[in-house]
């Protein structure tokens, strides 16, 4: 039985995800609002349609062999300020012809649960999720990290890192993007 509120739910999902395909998908099928929500998340996620594992060895590999420059935002599913910090990163690179990768690393959820949060990170290149013992992974990233999010690491073209809790300052962003 279809509820009289399901058409409204479909419209609300379309507005929340900013995805015209949600409206198209739900037209004539108001009972499919749940599937429409996931379709909108997948479309909004852009390139990040999968979640890569991030274990104790991943950070060293990314620093030695990963793209440069690049940004990594370490976040949790309940971090209310992380999307705003990611928006600062996205705003810093969106006018550039060669955009550095902007990556999100989920610390508390993986797989489809992590992908549900992809819509919060507009412009994200890749999503990772902790895979292993969280304290050991954090230790591998930064032994001084006090387990506070958002935790942002900017890797410049030379492989030098800048680390900050919260959004990076304009000076940090300039230094990150101007390194030869």
Question: Where on the chain are the PLM-derived regions?
Answer:
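A short beta-strand-turn-helix
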Residues: 48-69
